[in-house]
Amino acid sequence: MRSDRSRKRFVFLCVAPATILFFIFMILPTLNVFRMSLYERGAYSPNETFVGLKNFQHLLKDTQFIRSMQNMILLVVVVTIITFAFALVFAAILTREKIKGQNFFRIIFYIPNILSVVVISGIFSAIYKPENGMLNSILGLFRDMTDPILWKGEKLVIPSIIIAMVWQAVGYYMVMYMASMSSVPASLYESANLDGAGRLTQFFQITIPLVWTNIRTTLTFFIISTINMAFLFVKAMTSGGPNGASDVALNYMYSQKDAGLYGYSMAIGVVIFLFSFALSACVNRATSREPLEF
């Protein structure tokens, strides 16, 4: 009896500091964002005016906010699909095909993940330069480049950011999936070969189901992190330009805060928070299935 109490007291003492810090630095600020979204406040004035849902009503009429949300959703969906497709395929190839120098390729693919967003943005901004960038220089060997392609222009800026984001993320998830795939027993693939199953069938019927738990977990984390990464890449590469073509919701939120519209920016933050929560819940629900064991 005394040992049970001692154990509970020990657990409480271990958990209490983290719980208190989480409440102070996560829960309270989040609740304060919800509160501030219902008020109107100037940049340098401590006075607040309660406006209820007025800020949210303005959001529905704000075309730039709607555009920034569309850009954010597009980046999240496309980057997630491409990143996970490449990561799974590369992981399967490097794990199953017994390629020489496997560790070398693992390191090469992983390097972009250890670079900062600023460095990656600088690299791709140099590649995308209209006058002497690598892309236009290569294309100049095959066609007339009197009018250089504006890779960061209004039409191509989102695809250009997508490429940079995928390049940064794919190696990390490839390494994670390689670790999962390497634990799948070779006997399962041998049995599938005897039954006449091809590589593609084995990939979808054996590999994917057996590493699905890992895929599901990483998918949820990646989608949420992509919302933040999209903001970082946009801020570093374009600052939302040109003419707001690459603006995302988080970047627009900060621009409204810098303009002194604190309550309005907090309303944008609430929408992003609810969107992230709803999206993660939908992904969890859509990807839930009975785990397979081997």
PLM regions: where:
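A structural signal for multi-pass alpha-helical bundles of membrane permease subunits
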Residues: R2-F294
